[in-house]
């Protein structure tokens, strides 16, 4: 297999026919070499299928979180039935942001599913790559700022996850 071109060659031996077997001429076996291009996109298709499954799982988790938080409320009597405390997600701005952010993430995931299916069907589609190249070459400042914002967002998410784990450990010890 030629590693530079990505093609493999296979030899096809063609035996002599019955009409030439009985002749006393020299026997020649013809060998034809055909270039066989391997079917590409195998690993890309696998990655695309894994991407699609992860998107569906993330969509299910985001929708479950949004629905659970959005429908959570409780009324607690305090001393008597006349004085009551009511807790709802919209009492705290953090929980409201949580519901809105998960709703937006769910919408994004729903809208991105057709593109994920397209990468499964056609793993060699170059439109997305070309669009990224166009944005990177034309909007250099924009791409750098977006990259920085995404990295900062991931750092914030990791810190928040760490804070949740730390809070869980602190609550467990009490």
Curated annotation (Swiss-Prot):
Superkingdom per UniProt: Eukaryota
A GO CC term assigned to this protein in UniProt: plasma membrane
Ranges in the topological domain labelled Cytoplasmic: 1-46, 118-119, 172-174
Complex and partners: Homodimer and heterodimers.
Record-linked Pfam families: CASP_dom
Native organism: Triphysaria pusilla (Dwarf owl's-clover)
InterPro entries according to UniProt: CASP/CASPL, CASP_dom, CASPL
Organism lineage string: Eukaryota, Viridiplantae, Streptophyta, Embryophyta, Tracheophyta
Region (Disordered): 1-25
Protein name: CASP-like protein 1
Topological domain spans for side Extracellular: 68-96, 140-150
């Amino acid at each position: 297999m030629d590693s530079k071109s990505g093609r493999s060659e296979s030899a096809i031996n063609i035996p002599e026919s019955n009409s030439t077997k009985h002749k006393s001429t020299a026997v020649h076996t013809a060998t034809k070499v055909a270039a066989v291009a391997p079917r590409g996109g195998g690993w890309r298709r696998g990655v695309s299928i894994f991407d699609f499954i992860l998107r569906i799982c993330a969509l299910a988790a985001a929708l479950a979180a949004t629905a659970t938080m959005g429908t959570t409320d409780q009324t607690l009597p305090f001393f008597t039935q006349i004085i009551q405390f009511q807790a709802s997600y919209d009492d705290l701005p953090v929980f409201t942001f949580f519901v809105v952010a998960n709703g937006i993430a769910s919408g994004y995931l729903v809208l991105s599913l057709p593109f994920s299916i397209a990468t499964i069907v056609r793993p060699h589609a170059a439109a997305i790559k070309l669009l990224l190249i166009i944005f990177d070459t034309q909007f250099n400042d924009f791409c750098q700022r977006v990259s920085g914002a995404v990295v900062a967002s991931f750092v914030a998410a990791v810190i928040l996850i760490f804070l949740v784990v730390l809070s869980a450990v602190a609550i467990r010890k009490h």
